[in-house]
C-alpha cells in the first residue's frame, strides 16, 4: 500500500519530533484529526467526492512506516496530583512502556502469527477478505509487542492472550460495500468458514457487524 499524501504528512510530523520523554503530540495529531473530521463530513454529505474514491484515504500503513511511528514516546507525570488530573484509568508504573521501547510488533508476519493464535485459527479458511474488515481490540492486541517471556512459544502466547490479558476477548468483523441481499447470501459461507460462536449480527450505517468469540 502506497501511503496517501495525508498519511505521509502525518509520518513526517512524527519524524520531526524531538527525542526524549514529555514531547507534546497535540500539534502532530490535530491536523490528522481535523482531516478525519472532514472525511466524515464528506462521507455524510458528498459521497461522490473524489477524495473518497481512494479506499485507503485516512489510513496509514503502519508496517511500511518508519520506526518513528512504532516507538513509544512517554508522557511525563510529575506527581500523583498530575496523574489524577490527566488520567481516568491510569496505568500502573510497572505497566507503562518506557521511552524508546517498541509500541507495536516489528512486522506483518509477527502480527499474523499473533492474530492466528489470538483467534485460535478460526479465520484461517477465510481466503477472500474482500468486503471483510477485522477491527477493534482484537487487532490492537495482536499489534502490541509481547515480552520475551510471553512470546517464548505459541503456548506462551496463547496463555497470555486468553488467560492473562484478554480472557473475555472477542473478534469483530465488519462487512462493507454489500447490499442486504449480498450480505444474506454471504453469511452462510462466512459463518461456515469462521468456526466461532456468533454472538451478534447487526447493521451499523452502511456496514454489517459480526461479533463472535473463539
Annotate each PLM feature.
Residues 1-214:
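Catalytic cores of the polymerase beta-like nucleotidyltransferase superfamily
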